[in-house]
């Protein structure tokens, strides 16, 4: 069975169509209206070997907040749906990724208990026109809607772009690891018998 999902979300602020495949080739077709987010999602898909298509229209004439947040919501919902019953998955993923001066770590538990922790400080408030605080908003909504426990640690860095890039690459790699099917796992990887 294909591990993929398509999500549509329309509000007074945004209209989003998103398709996601866990077992992809790292291909991304992205029209987000938020150039820096487009760049980060492209990295996420490439390094996680996911196929991701996003067609988003939002009130970016105000700012990028609603569009960024709502794409995070849709991607989280797509991840949850694509995982199905989670039988046979590894469940946990951990990735360290360096990007020049920056080092980021992302740790994931696909536990069905949403939680988000972020440690790190970005030296700049903006990358181009993108408000850096939206990285937190995107990741928190992603974790909430995917019902994952997501820990993001930016260990160090000087360049904000590099630091965020390391986070999104690590996110892709950690999610890829957590969603891999392990033939040794019988049923769901939990002593509770469900996730």
Curated annotation (Swiss-Prot):
Gene3D superfamilies named in the record: Imidazole glycerol phosphate dehydratase, domain 1
Compartments where located: Cytoplasm
Keyword Iron: no
UniProt GO molecular function: imidazoleglycerol-phosphate dehydratase activity
Keywords: Amino-acid biosynthesis, Cytoplasm, Histidine biosynthesis, Lyase
HAMAP family: HisB
Alphabetical list of CDD domains matching this protein: IGPD
GO BP annotation list: L-histidine biosynthetic process
Species this chain originates from: Geobacillus thermodenitrificans (strain NG80-2)
PROSITE patterns: IGP_DEHYDRATASE_1, IGP_DEHYDRATASE_2
Gene giving rise to this polypeptide: hisB
Pathway: Amino-acid biosynthesis; L-histidine biosynthesis; L-histidine from 5-phospho-alpha-D-ribose 1-diphosphate: step 6/9
TM annotation in the entry: none
Entry-linked Pfam families: IGPD
Protein name, as recorded: Imidazoleglycerol-phosphate dehydratase
Keyword Cytoplasm: yes
Catalysis performed (reactions): D-erythro-1-(imidazol-4-yl)glycerol 3-phosphate = 3-(imidazol-4-yl)-2-oxopropyl phosphate + H2O
Family classification: Belongs to the imidazoleglycerol-phosphate dehydratase family.
Enzyme Commission number: 4.2.1.19
GO CC list: cytoplasm
């Amino acid at each position: 069975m294909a591990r993929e999902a398509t999500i549509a979300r329309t509000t007074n602020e945004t209209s989003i169509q998103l398709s996601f495949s866990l077992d992809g080739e790292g291909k991304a077709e992205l029209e987000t209206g938020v150039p820096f987010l487009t760049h980060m999602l492209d990295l996420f898909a490439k390094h996680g070997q996911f196929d991701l298509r996003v067609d988003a229209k939002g009130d970016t004439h105000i700012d990028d907040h609603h569009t960024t947040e709502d794409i995070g919501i849709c991607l989280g919902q797509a991840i949850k749906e694509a995982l199905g019953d989670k039988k046979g998955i590894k469940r946990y993923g951990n990735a360290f990724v360096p990007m020049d001066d920056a080092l980021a770590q992302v740790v994931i538990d696909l536990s069905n208990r949403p939680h988000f922790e972020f440690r790190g400080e970005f030296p700049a408030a903006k990358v181009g026109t993108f408000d850096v605080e939206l990285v937190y908003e995107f990741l928190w909504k992603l974790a909430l809607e995917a019902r994952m426990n997501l820990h993001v640690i930016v260990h160090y860095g000087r360049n904000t772009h590099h630091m965020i890039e390391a986070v999104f690459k690590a996110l892709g790699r950690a999610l890829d690891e957590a969603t891999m099917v392990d033939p040794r796992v019988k049923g769901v990887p939990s002593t509770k018998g469900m996730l």
